[in-house]
Amino acid sequence: MASTDSPRYSRIAITLHWLIALLIIGQLVGGKVMTNMGFSTLKFEIYQYHKSFGIMILLLSLFRLVWRLTHKAPALPETMLPWQKRVAHLSHKAFYILMIGIPLSGWAMVSASTLNIKTKLFKLIPWPHIPGITPSESLEKSLKNAHEWLAILAVSYTHLTLPTKA
């Protein structure tokens, strides 16, 4: 693990943080809009971009996790109580689980879809379905519910933890 005595996160960590945060906000808004639209070509296009940005979030989050595991985070303030430090560490872990779990559940849902619509990231890069997941209406429905509930959990969790300072 790269060691630093800096009281701040690195520029790369900060950039990843804000880039992923903005992408997630866009995904939440886009997800809400597209699920409330009637069937149309525009809805199909929004779904395709939603998948593209979701995979982008997944890849950036995995990179961010590797970066975090190989670069020491700044120490939490000494004024924080031990239980507050534990909560801060658990909160970070929960966010990583959600940043990776939500896109994975979406990718799995698309992979299980009986519609078998191919994914092309930003209309350019073919993206495969997850190997081993076969089309199934019941599995797709379960994964859709998981995807939506994880997103609701992420929004709720953010609202609960945003006022706290770690």
Indicate where each model-derived feature is located:
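Conserved small/polar residues in nucleotide/adenosyl-binding loops
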Residues: 158-164
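Transmembrane alpha-helical insertion/packing segments
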Residues: 2-63
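Conserved histidines in hydrophobic membrane contexts and catalytic metal-binding motifs
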Residues: 46, 50, 100, 147
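Juxtamembrane non-transmembrane "cap" segments at the membrane-aqueous interface
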Residues: 108-132
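Juxtamembrane helix-capping/reentrant segments at transmembrane boundaries
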Residues: 47, 77-91
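Membrane-helix interface/capping segments
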Residues: 65-81
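Hydrophobic alpha-helical membrane-insertion segments
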Residues: 91-113
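Hydrophobic alpha-helical transmembrane segments
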Residues: 133-156
